[in-house]
């Protein structure tokens, strides 16, 4: 299993701008061009993959971000998701999609960092 070692150790504060890394959460890349894929994801996650550029769909547990015509990124809304739950999700997706040649499932949790920006100068 992945071991998260963040290079960002503290919150950065500037004039009316705060920058902090969001705690590491599971991120899984999905790729498929099969029709059955959307239905299968809908059953597993209770979310239908978005089919328009730069859109997302989600529920209380997960968000699904459209990356390209045949690519999506799942990330968890639950910062407290246990390692067992993360492993179970990845295994379920792998068994239901990759093993059945419906698409590709890749854990990219260590490839992406989520950063929270807040303050009056976020849009400057």
Which role fits each region the language model picked out?
Residues 1-124:
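Basic, glycine/lysine-rich polyanion-binding surfaces/domains
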């Amino acid at each position: 299993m992945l071991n998260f070692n963040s290079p960002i150790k503290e919150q950065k504060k500037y004039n009316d701008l705060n920058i902090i890394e969001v705690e590491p959460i599971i991120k899984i890349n999905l790729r498929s061009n099969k029709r059955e894929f959307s239905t299968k994801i809908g059953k597993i996650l209770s979310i239908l993959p978005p089919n328009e550029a730069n859109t997302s769909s989600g529920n209380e547990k997960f968000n699904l971000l459209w990356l390209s015509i045949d690519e999506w990124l799942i990330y968890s809304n639950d910062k407290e998701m246990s390692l067992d739950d993360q492993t179970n999700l990845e295994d379920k997706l792998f068994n239901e999609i990759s093993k059945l040649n419906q698409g590709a499932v890749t854990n990219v949790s260590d490839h992406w960092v989520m950063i929270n920006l807040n303050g009056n100068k976020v849009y400057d």
